[in-house]
Amino acid sequence: VTKPVAADAWRYPYLWHRQHGDGETEGRKTRPVAFVAVLPGKAGGTNLFILAITSTQPGRDRIAVRVPEIERRRAGLDPIPLWVIVDEYNHDILESPAYFEPGARIGAFSPSFHKKVISAFIAAVRAGQSKAIPRAD
């Protein structure tokens, strides 16, 4: 099984913060996501920090990074306007079996675009503006 690395784009059943707040535990559909960070955990396991990619233009109250056309192609995404949402994220553990299917990797962003996304994500986290949605059991 291919393991995700930072800057990868995969298909994943992302659980939105509003859905989590309503008591849902499963993402309603598989969507493109970006792995903003893949880090070893203190207790073992691999921590995954997963950002949703959406074609719905974010409102002014959301924090997002628009995906340029060249990056959409690199990541294997649809040729339509897309945004990476950085004000919420799914936190999952790679070794928890639930959500990763073979062949789910669709591409990867360039190092320069990934740096832009991770910078926006870190800024949102530090400002207390990015909400974690835990996915691991």
Positions of the model-derived regions?
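Compact nucleic-acid interaction/catalytic patches
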Residues: 20-30, 36-73
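Short N-terminal edge-element motif at the start of the domain
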Residues: 1-3, 11
